Amino acid sequence: MLVKTLYYRLVEGTFAKAMLVLDEKGTLYYASLGEDSNALRETLVTDFASKQRQFQLKPMVTLSNHERADYTALCFLKLMEEEEDWKNEGEESLQQKGAKRIPIEFIFGTELQRKVWQQLLEIPVGEVRYYGNIVEALGLPKSASRAVGNACGANKIALVVPCHRVIAQTGKLTGYRWGLATKKQILKMELGDAYTTLVSE
């Protein structure tokens, strides 16, 4: 089996650092959030441990031409900017545009989880969905809410695949792979004044 080389890079936004994994074309395969660079590196190694036969990871600086990867990283940083930096730019915010400009590829997850992640891509900035909404959109039985929740928790492409926009029917913020405090901060940034109406703390 041919082993594909992917490149990792650490970037720093206004509320967190992010570990990104991309290919030479700028396609994003992985994005993890955190405050500690060493912890992000350790998580990267752990998350890719089961993928060693398919992928090898190298630092981005080893890529001779990383112009496309740099562009993707720049677009990702737009997703990490404070609200006032992006909320007013015509019909679409910089945040929304940034997400649309980032090509992604799923290499983790089950078939169902990938279907859930694909559905999450349909949630616009400034809106939230309940787990039940995702179940209904995918035509799954109502009992699948837990599976949808697990899929959100298994997402390994932070922000671009917006699992942070899925909340409980009560409006309560439930688990988030990168911490509830981070989920809260992102939603406050995206929802603005609507946060207190849509989210119950």
Curated annotation (Swiss-Prot):
EC numbers: 2.1.1.63
**Which CDD domains does this chain map to?**
ATase
What additional remark is attached to this entry? This enzyme catalyzes only one turnover and therefore is not strictly catalytic. According to one definition, an enzyme is a biocatalyst that acts repeatedly and over many reaction cycles.
Which terms does the record give in the GO molecular function aspect?
Answer: DNA binding; methylated-DNA-[protein]-cysteine S-methyltransferase activity
Kind of enzyme, top EC level? transferase
Keyword Oxidoreductase among record annotations: no
List, from the UniProt record, the residues annotated as the active site of this protein. Answer: C163 (nucleophile)
Keyword terms of this UniProt record: DNA damage, DNA repair, DNA-binding, Methyltransferase, Nucleus, Transferase
Database matches in SUPFAM superfamilies: Methylated DNA-protein cysteine methyltransferase, C-terminal domain
Instruction: Please verify whether the record's keywords include Transcription regulation.
Output: no
Query: Gene that codes for this?
Result: MGT1
**Transmembrane segments annotated in the record for this chain:** none
Which PROSITE patterns does the annotation name?
MGMT
Its family remark reads: Belongs to the MGMT family.
PANTHER family (alphabetical): METHYLATED-DNA--PROTEIN-CYSTEINE METHYLTRANSFERASE (PTHR10815:SF13)
Localization per Swiss-Prot or TrEMBL:
Nucleus
Name of the protein this chain belongs to: Methylated-DNA--protein-cysteine methyltransferase
Q: What does this protein do?
A: Involved in the cellular defense against the biological effects of O6-methylguanine (O6-MeG) and O4-methylthymine (O4-MeT) in DNA. Repairs the methylated nucleobase in DNA by stoichiometrically transferring the methyl group to a cysteine residue in the enzyme. This is a suicide reaction: the enzyme is irreversibly inactivated.
Recorded hits in Pfam families, A to Z, give: DNA_binding_1
Report the GO terms under cellular component. nucleus
Give me the residues that bind DNA, please. Y131, G132, R146
GO BP annotation list:
DNA alkylation repair; methylation
The reaction(s) this protein catalyses: a 6-O-methyl-2'-deoxyguanosine in DNA + L-cysteinyl-[protein] = S-methyl-L-cysteinyl-[protein] + a 2'-deoxyguanosine in DNA; a 4-O-methyl-thymidine in DNA + L-cysteinyl-[protein] = a thymidine in DNA + S-methyl-L-cysteinyl-[protein]
